[in-house]
Curated annotation (Swiss-Prot):
Disulfide-bonded cysteines: none
Subcellular location: Membrane
Protein name as annotated: Enterobactin synthase component D
Pathway recorded for this protein: Siderophore biosynthesis; enterobactin biosynthesis
GO cellular component: enterobactin synthetase complex; plasma membrane
Pfam families on file: 4PPT_N (PF17837), ACPS (PF01648)
Coiled coil feature spans: none
EC number(s) on file: 2.7.8.-
């Protein structure tokens, strides 16, 4: 499959972005993935997206001296090496990944049309959040896409600690040209209730990318070895 990769410093991390041409995908492209058998029943588009995401993840891991391909967990989540946290996302013909010494979540979404934003808004935000989005200087479709993406990034950062929370479990409290703040409610995770999480964002073409990096650690989180931590951008 034809791909192009470039790293992009953002919010104290380095995003590894992979643009790919799904039409050039061939089944044998998957053979270098140790878990390729688990993708046998997936559709062609899904296989291409998965491959691009893992290519981005491999680039991210190599940056910290780790040569590995993240496997697939029981909940289809990426499995990262001990002591490292990571996140993968893809949309249309772009995939990206990020590695960190602390919990991290990244998401990329195509900016909604006006019609789609109007239709989906009630399922993503409440009336208070709508006022915040409308008070920003951003067009509503862009603002709503950011709200959706920010909540996705927060969920990814803590996916192993929460049980499929709804969009109403994290509320937008502020939105400006560079970041979004979200207030976590008990429905998100009791141990994280009433915390505020800051999500950084930027626009790339007709898509937005959001990233949350959280210093929160839990009893079973393992710290990365010093040799690895020293190589990870702060």
């Amino acid at each position: 499959m034809l791909t192009s990769h470039f790293p992009l410093p953002f919010a104290g991390h380095r995003l590894h972005i992979v643009d790919f041409d799904a039409s050039s995908f061939h089944e044998h492209d998957l053979l270098w993935l140790p878990h390729h058998d688990r993708l046998r029943s997936a559709g062609r588009k899904r296989k291409a997206e998965h491959l691009a995401g893992r290519i981005a993840a491999v680039h991210a891991l190599r940056e910290v001296g780790v040569r590995a391909v993240p496997g697939i967990g029981d909940k289809r989540q990426p499995l990262w090496p001990d002591g490292l946290f990571g996140s993968i996302s893809h949309c249309a013909s772009t995939a990206l990944a990020v590695i960190s010494r602390q919990r991290v979540g990244v998401d990329i979404e195509k900016i909604m049309s006006q019609h789609t934003a109007t239709e989906l808004a009630p399922s993503i935000i409440d009336s208070d959040e709508r006022q915040i989005l409308q008070a920003s200087s951003l067009p509503f479709p862009l603002a709503l896409t950011l709200a959706f993406s920010a909540k996705e990034s927060v969920y990814k950062a803590f996916s192993d600690r929460v049980t499929l929370p709804g969009f109403d479990s994290a509320k937008i409290t502020s939105l400006n040209a560079t970041h979004i703040s979200l207030h976590l409610l008990p429905a998100f995770a009791a141990m994280m209730a009433e915390r505020t999480v800051r999500t950084e964002w930027f626009q790339r073409g007709n898509s937005v990318i959001t990233l949350v990096s959280a210093i929160t650690r839990f009893p079973h989180d393992r710290s990365a070895p010093a040799s690895i931590l020293s190589a990870i951008p702060r």
